């Protein structure tokens, strides 16, 4: 069947119910597994094994594919996202691969919208709705336990050597709110902001949430000492239960962990 893919500006020809899926986005991969479609996945990105135990070939990374492996697994659907993956998506589409591009989510609602799109692509909207309901219920339970008043949280995200602050147009904002905190940049109409230490201090955070990756590890406690700040540190990392930048179902675990970290920091 032909489906219009807006990020590509073109129609893509996909089967009614895909049987051989390559997913190049870890959040989408994990969502498919939780929807009951792990057996349909025949290829992954190099980042996906952090979130799923599937024993299938690694077809590529976030920005490239191994063409010989892609030909071997012969997918009838390739899942990819916008942002920096858009160029790869267009290349695969030009080469005739059955690629569908989903938007990078700016919020929790965007994540749920992508899950519904996955359900539509797999011809199983009910599986998508069931996952969303479970996710919403867990988040509602956590948010009901939020401390009063909520502590002010500053989230600093290190993408390798590149540092950003989490604004209001991110699902990290939603994660902080669900876990019981208040994002100090939640009123800013942007996603990721350039580092502005003076503005951070003006907004007077109580908790310092830092995410970094093993290739360039950054410790919250070290930054506090370096900057002379006095606030409670919370250290996030790439493990599914502590990963605040991942948009798959293990966000439920990350929200529980962050909720517990916030509670402990307030004692």
Label each residue range with its predicted role.
Residues 51-57, 69, 109-114, 219-220, ...:
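Short, charged, surface-exposed secondary-structure boundary motifs
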Residues 1-4, 10-14, 20, 87-161, ...:
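Extracytoplasmic substrate-binding proteins
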Residues 2-5, 19-73, 77-88, 184:
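A short, structured surface patch at a secondary-structure boundary
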Residues 88-94, 218-230:
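Short, aromatic/basic amphipathic alpha-helical patches
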Residues 47, 165-191:
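Alpha-helical, coiled-coil/dimerization segments enriched in small aliphatic residues
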Residues 18, 64-83, 97, 194-213:
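Proline-aspartate-enriched helix->loop->beta-strand connector
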Residues 37, 54-55, 95-97, 179, ...:
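Short, structured coil segments at secondary-structure junctions
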Residues 31, 69-72, 91, 175, ...:
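Well-formed, non-transmembrane alpha-helical positions, independent of function
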